[in-house]
Every structure is written in structure tokens, then in C-alpha cells.
């Protein structure tokens, strides 16, 4: 399965029991290289991804400044070192899951809930971790 298929079929899929889906999603290498992304994933800066990677190494580094992606600032509401970062901006937010080699991004807006976004992103992340990725 191609990385683009993972984004299209597992991240941008319809959420069970609803007609809703994430606003944008992507799979990036921990070096910031894009493996696959949805058409509307924000154009990000390399230093924004570097800051996310640093947060996974040292949880709490993004708390004072927020998580920035494509110029949008998300307030970090939860961060587990080496695992997951969750952020909020108004009625929407972001979830980033780290695997051994990748960062999985999911961005949502209402009516999608934080829990639905977390479930989609983390389910794929856990699967990739099981596959050694």
C-alpha cells in the first residue's frame, strides 16, 4: 500500500457513523520529508516540524509558544514524550502521532470531535508501530 493510500483511506476516510472526515492529514518522515499528504494540508516550514520533533524528545517545549503548522498556532493541550501531541485552536485542533520513522498529522474542525481525530490518527500510528515503521 502506498503512503498516499494510507492518507486517503485511513486518515481522510469518513468517520464511522457520520458523513464527516478530517480537514487535512499527512504522513511525514521525522526529518520533515513529506511521505504523503491530503491536497489541503497546510504548507509548513521546516522549523515548524523541527519544533514538533523536539517536543517528542522533550515534552513541554511547545507549551509556552504553541504548536505552529502552516502559520496556524495551536495551543498544546496534551503532550506525551515520544508518543502523541494534541493541540486546540477554536472549535478545531490537531493530533500528531509519532512512530519509529514517521509523524502522522490529523487536523480537524467541527463537527469532528477531538476524540474522533485522536482515534483516527493514533489507530494508524499504532498499526505502523506494530509493522516496525
UniProtKB/Swiss-Prot annotation:
Pfam families: Profilin (PF00235)
CDD domains per the UniProt record, alphabetical: PROF
Tissue: Expressed in pollen (at protein and mRNA level).
Alphabetized InterPro entries for the sequence: PFN (IPR048278), PFN_euk (IPR005455), PFN_sf (IPR036140), Profilin_CS (IPR027310)
Homology family: Belongs to the profilin family.
PANTHER family in alphabetical order: PROFILIN, PROFILIN-3
SMART domains xref list: PROF
Annotated PROSITE patterns: PROFILIN (PS00414)
Protein name as annotated: Profilin Sal k 4.0301
Localization terms from the record: Cytoplasm, Cytoskeleton
Assembly and interaction partners: Occurs in many kinds of cells as a complex with monomeric actin in a 1:1 ratio.
Stored Gene3D superfamilies: Dynein light chain 2a, cytoplasmic
Predominant location category: cytoplasm
GO annotation, cellular component aspect: cell cortex; cytoskeleton
Cystine connections: 95-117
Keyword tags: Actin-binding, Allergen, Cytoplasm, Cytoskeleton, Disulfide bond
Function: Binds to actin and affects the structure of the cytoskeleton. At high concentrations, profilin prevents the polymerization of actin, whereas it enhances it at low concentrations.
MF terms (GO), sorted A to Z: actin monomer binding
Organism: Kali turgidum
